[in-house]
A protein has these predicted regions:
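Catalytic core of nucleotidyl cyclases, primarily class III adenylyl/guanylyl cyclases
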Residues: 40, 73-105, 119-163, 173
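Catalytic NTP-binding/metal-coordinating core of nucleotidyl cyclase/transferase enzymes
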Residues: 26-108
Length: 178
């Protein structure tokens, strides 16, 4: 149970962590179910990064603050952070906690993430940094969830066409400026 708490703390709400501790098969055996997946990506990293010059520690700290800001709405909605990829994130709703309104929850979570970015911008602009934006792609469909990877390194993940579609939607945000 402690290993599960250590693995998922910070990636899932306490409610989700407790459910996984009570049902470890949800991790190891996996599941196939309808989920809502969201990819989010920071916009404006280059100007932000350049504003730090050689201060890598400062940039690392501000990026961690950004990730904290966009993660909290996910945890508040009982979603689960699947992974961080550079300045992007991927999270899922309706797994492992059932949410019959998960498409709506995912969209509301995305809006809450945008509000969190606005508050984050208030802070960094006051410090003389350029503001950033966030694009998001949300899709609902079938997902295959579970512990995946090699024996040397593995993590909880979600796979499926619905995941690829959410990623493509997020990439279109760049093209259409949303």
């Amino acid at each position: 149970k402690q290993a599960i708490k250590k693995q998922f703390a910070g990636y899932a709400s306490p409610t989700v962590v407790r459910l996984l501790q009570e049902n470890p098969a949800l991790i190891k055996d996996g599941m196939k179910k309808e989920v809502s997946i969201c990819f989010s990506d920071l916009r404006g990293f280059t100007p932000l990064g350049e504003s730090f010059g050689d201060d890598v520690k400062g940039l690392t700290n501000i990026m961690n603050s950004y990730m904290d800001a966009i993660t909290q709405p996910v945890l508040d909605a009982d979603g689960m952070i699947i992974k961080y990829i550079g300045d992007a994130s991927m999270h899922v709703h309706n797994a492992p906690i059932e949410d019959k309104h998960h498409p709506r929850t995912a969209v509301q979570c995305g809006l809450d993430m945008l509000r969190a970015v606005e508050k984050f911008n208030d802070k960094i602009v006051a410090e003389g940094r350029p503001p950033v934006g966030m694009g998001a792609g949300i899709n609902t469909g079938l997902g295959y969830l579970g512990e995946m990877g090699s024996t040397a390194r593995h993590s909880y993940d979600v796979l499926g066409d619905s995941v690829s579609t959410a990623a493509r939607i997020e990439s279109k945000c760049k093209e259409y400026g949303c």
